[in-house]
Amino acid sequence: YGNIRMNNFFGVKDIFIDNDIIYLSSSYYEIEKDCHGLALYKSSIENNEKLYINEWDEIFKSEKCLKEEIHTKKRMPLASSGGRIVKLDENNLLLSVGDYAVDGYYAKEKFSQDLSNDYGKILQIDLLTKQHEIFSYGHRNVQGLYAENKKNIFATEHGPHGGDELNKIYREKNYGWPLATFGTGYFD
């Protein structure tokens, strides 16, 4: 992985290749702070008989690094992390960032409904400036993301037990998690 450190079994989430550029989303872990989140990297590809990937450039990192103590109930580390990548247009990608089970059940907070953080969102990332903005929110764990053009964007989402979803995605729309779901808690 070059200069990307994988310290957990939830490492790489997705890759997206655009001509000679490869994008990779991955969970990250900061040892000195003992916290984790999601990051997006890019690199150029050189194809000389063997695929070689140069050093990675970080273009996004979730702004709030999460400590495990945020959870009030036992859960799988880094569950519901998202990480799907799709190209929106020439200069923008969409990236799903899961709620990391900070959903009002496993933790007191409900990140998906809080517009002051990156979690539980689909983000639009400007590849020229590395700036990002919320495209849609109220997501739990988007695991499939497709964009035919700016008007036809679809996402599949892992819901809680019995609550998986297929949604057409619209800019600035709230998809309801965890306030609205057909699923139930795994331990209810």
Tell me what each language-model feature is.
Residues 1-104, 144-147, 151-159:
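Acidic, Gly/Ser/Thr-rich repeat motifs that build Ca2+-stabilized beta-propeller blades
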Residues 2-12, 98-188:
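Beta-propeller domain segments
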